[in-house]
């Protein structure tokens, strides 16, 4: 199956499908005429006498140097080779596929001036599985993601490396094995390919999709913890949240009510419970998780716009002029990444406090210490809670805003940068930490509920526990725990826990 993209209006759901399923994509042929028109205009400018940045001049601080018409192709090739300065581990295939799809969307708007054969090559590489090797580090998020996108483009011209059928090869060999030929870049094409925010945006989108799934699952594990601790569902009453008015809070409260509906555990202590109020990590879940949901939704709107944007320079305007601007500056992406980081950090922080509550017999309302069936002989989930604290602390350190840490580059021509790529890339580690924290809460919450037997939890949460127990058996005695934590985290990552509950309960990214 190949997804057909309409540049300028590709929805978030399609972008998530590209990220998660790795489907090949192509541009709607209706946009080809606009692409060819802009390419023809670039060819006219290149043949003329007027200097235009990036077409017949040098780049960055070297923009004042005029390039002879006979050197234009060499200029583009040199640009790509000189900018391949990435370091670190290769980005994963699903991230690179998303980067390439975003580049197609941008080029397909018909304002960049590349020839149709450039777009076709990217489409064919995605279809046949030639995936450029892009190192993870090297971009400051302005002027675009130059180094990582140069590595992408290098593969297109037969330079650098690419992955093909799981093998890392010289790009020329990978293209040959796939039956493809490298492209010879014409005027401006190299610049159009590397001068954009697609790497930062792809990483931020990946962070967003991972964070949203974790946020949904955290509502489930939070409900489990509430029932395990014999907490009250009264703070989730609809009117409390409508009186405040925040959409995320309202949606989170609604989800928690639905998840806990029908719990016999809850019914057992509706009367005679001497506890007046639960701790904040139980009582304030709608307020905290809802606020996180709100900023994830705000980031989603920003990133959907950016994914459909034209972010190279110069641009071919509707009147045919080539005009220099600054759409390559990824400040919106940097801000969105920082917002996502805050949400990821806070979801993990409140989840960790619920884990700590459940393993503490002074707070858990009758549960054994560390949820061990034979405390003392067994340590139960003692160190699982410690691990969750370690991961929470690491995320707090990583949540520092990246966007405020600009530094001048390129001989002060590029004197303010966004740091969007770094800000977005750290989301991969932060969400991995969060998935592990939520997985640990799933283990503690489910075990806590099981220790309340013969009282039973709600039908929705019972389905979640059944999915969990299909991969992680209940803890009777101490055992090697690392596999349990790994398997529980995988149930968060692959959406199995979120998918266990009835459709419509968990809030989407739609505001």
From Swiss-Prot:
It catalyses: L-histidine = trans-urocanate + NH4(+). Pathway: Amino-acid degradation; L-histidine degradation into L-glutamate; N-formimidoyl-L-glutamate from L-histidine: step 1/3. InterPro entries: Aromatic_Lyase, Fumarase/histidase_N, HutH, L-Aspartase-like, Phe/His_NH3-lyase_AS. It comes from the Bacteria. One of its GO terms (biological process) is L-histidine catabolic process to glutamate and formate. It is an enzyme of class 4 (lyase). There is a cross-link at residues 142-144 (5-imidazolinone (Ala-Gly)). Contains an active site 4-methylidene-imidazol-5-one (MIO), which is formed autocatalytically by cyclization and dehydration of residues Ala-Ser-Gly. The keyword Cytoplasm applies. The keyword Lyase applies. CDD domains: PAL-HAL. Belongs to the PAL/histidase family. This is Histidine ammonia-lyase. It comes from Brucella anthropi (strain ATCC 49188 / DSM 6882 / CCUG 24695 / JCM 21032 / LMG 3331 / NBRC 15819 / NCTC 12168 / Alc 37). The gene is hutH.
């Amino acid at each position: 199956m190949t997804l057909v993209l309409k540049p300028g209006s590709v929805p978030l759901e399609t972008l998530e499908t590209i990220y998660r399923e790795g489907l090949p994509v192509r541009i709607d042929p209706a946009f080809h005429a606009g692409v060819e028109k802009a390419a023809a205009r670039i060819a006219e400018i290149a043949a003329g006498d007027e200097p235009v940045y990036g077409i017949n001049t040098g780049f960055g601080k070297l923009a004042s140097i005029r390039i002879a018409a006979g050197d234009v192709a060499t200029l583009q090739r040199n640009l790509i080779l000189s900018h391949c300065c990435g370091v670190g581990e290769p980005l994963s295939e699903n991230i690179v596929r998303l980067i390439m799809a975003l580049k197609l969307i941008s080029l397909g708007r018909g304002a960049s001036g590349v020839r149709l054969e450039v777009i076709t090559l990217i489409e064919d590489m995605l279809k046949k599985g030639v995936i450029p090797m892009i190192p993870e580090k090297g971009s400051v998020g302005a002027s675009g993601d130059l180094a990582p996108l140069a590595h992408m483009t290098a593969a297109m011209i037969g330079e650098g490396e690419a992955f093909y059928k799981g093998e890392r090869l010289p790009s020329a060999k990978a293209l040959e094995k796939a039956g493809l030929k490298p492209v010879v870049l014409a005027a401006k094409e190299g610049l159009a390919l590397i001068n954009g925010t697609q790497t930062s945006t792809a990483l931020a989108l990946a962070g967003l999709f991972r964070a949203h799934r974790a946020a949904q699952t955290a509502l489930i594990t939070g409900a489990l913890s509430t029932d395990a601790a014999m907490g009250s569902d009264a703070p989730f009453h609809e009117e409390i949240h409508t009186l405040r008015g925040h959409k995320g809070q309202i949606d989170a409260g609604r989800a928690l009510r639905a998840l806990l509906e029908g719990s016999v555990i809850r019914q057992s202590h509706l009367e005679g419970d001497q506890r007046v109020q639960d701790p904040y990590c139980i009582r304030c879940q709608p307020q905290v998780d809802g606020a996180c949901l709100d900023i994830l939704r705000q980031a989603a709107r920003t990133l959907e716009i950016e994914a459909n944007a034209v972010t190279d320079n110069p641009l071919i305007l509707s009147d045919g002029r080539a005009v220099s601007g600054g759409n390559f500056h990824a400040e919106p992406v940097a801000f969105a990444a920082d917002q996502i980081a805050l949400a990821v950090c806070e979801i993990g922080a409140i989840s960790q406090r619920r884990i700590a509550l459940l393993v503490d017999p002074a707070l858990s309302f009758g549960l054994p210490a560390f949820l061990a069936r034979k405390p003392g002989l067994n340590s139960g989930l003692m160190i699982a809670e410690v691990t969750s604290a370690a991961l929470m602390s690491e995320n707090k350190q990583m949540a520092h805003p990246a966007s405020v840490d600009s530094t001048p580059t390129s001989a002060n021509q590029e004197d303010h940068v966004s740091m969007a790529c770094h800000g977005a890339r750290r989301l991969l580690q932060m969400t991995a930490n969060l998935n592990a924290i939520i997985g640990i809460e799933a283990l503690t919450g489910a075990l806590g509920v099981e220790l309340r037997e013969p009282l039973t939890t709600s039908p929705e949460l019972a389905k979640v526990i059944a999915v969990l127990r299909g991969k992680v058996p209940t803890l009777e005695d101490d055992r090697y725990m690392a596999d349990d934590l790994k398997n529980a985290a995988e149930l968060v990552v692959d959406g199995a826990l979120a998918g266990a509950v009835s459709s419509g309960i968990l809030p989407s990214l739609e505001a």
